[in-house]
Amino acid sequence: MLNRRDFIRASLFGGVAAATLPSLLLQSYAQQAAIKTTTETVNSQVSLVTGSDRADMAFRTLQPFSREIAQAVGNKRIVLKPNFVSSSIQLSATHCDTMEGILEFFKSINKLDNVIIAESPADGPTIVAYDNYKFIPVAEKYKVSLVDLDETPIQLLYLIDEIDFRPKPVRVSSYLMDRNNYVVSVARMKTHDRIIATLSLKNIVVGAPIKDIGFVSGRNRPAGTRNDKPLVHGNGIRGINYNLFTSAYHLRPDLAFIDGYDGMQGNGPTGGTAVDSRVCLAGLDWLAVDRIGVELMGIDAATIGYMNFCADAGMGQFDINKIDVIGERVANHIKPYELPRTIERQLEWMTPLREPAAPPSSTPPQQPRANS
């Protein structure tokens, strides 16, 4: 196994981050035009499997899309984005066996020659998470690079803050914004303390903002270092739901994969407890995959703001009656997840901030009478 110094030298992609500031308005129009609106076309497909072996389940989940994935990848670089919201809590993070099954799948379709695994944990150095979760031997076995997104070139997104609604610049890794990369979200099935459920989209959107090199959360945080991920939260329930929605025009997976072998319920994304769901699901329409994910968790999809916003914008299929599930029947694997204790506050997005102002009166003001 590589030691940490050798690992950094041999595997992590470094480089000076170069911030770019394109015309976000024009870019947004272009991104919207590029998104295929599935709600007016054929049904979306989601693969659903069950089993007792993580790697085998991951491999079988992706098999129904072998031809489509191989064609879409072409000569693109494949970016596998695990979920390491914490560097030390395994239940909150993508399992190395799951990643091995996904790598084995790409090997089976002859697309393993240009694959990287790329992540930026929320709480500290990426190398610590790769080491703790035993990703280094997996990367060595399949001869793929482990990348620290905090050391990649950056672009800027502007997201809102509920406090003043002024756009805030957020540094995000260009690796996850570059449409010349084939981005795969390898997410865990978890509840969330702000947006009820965190699945394939959120793994990409909140994983993309970078941290300063050396940043760690808590009391040991070096002076002057910052982490841009909290900016996505928008200082409130309305802010985070809107930011996830608008970011999806720029940051979204080409292939969505959710590991529900054992999910997290309650106070996710790090403080919850395990649910023995024993499922994996995947598809090319990330919104359809996330929709089936919340169904399997027994969560009312109407309560999840950002997913409904994305559905209204035509980013994917959200109507469960228009999603064809390949493999297992969804109804046979629904396990209601305990919701976070903050659930009532999380529904604030469903009500307006204030009542709309009364329209101005159309009756002209009365002129004062002249004294007779």
Where are these regions (language model features)?
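N-terminal and secondary-structure boundary signal
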Residues: M1-S372
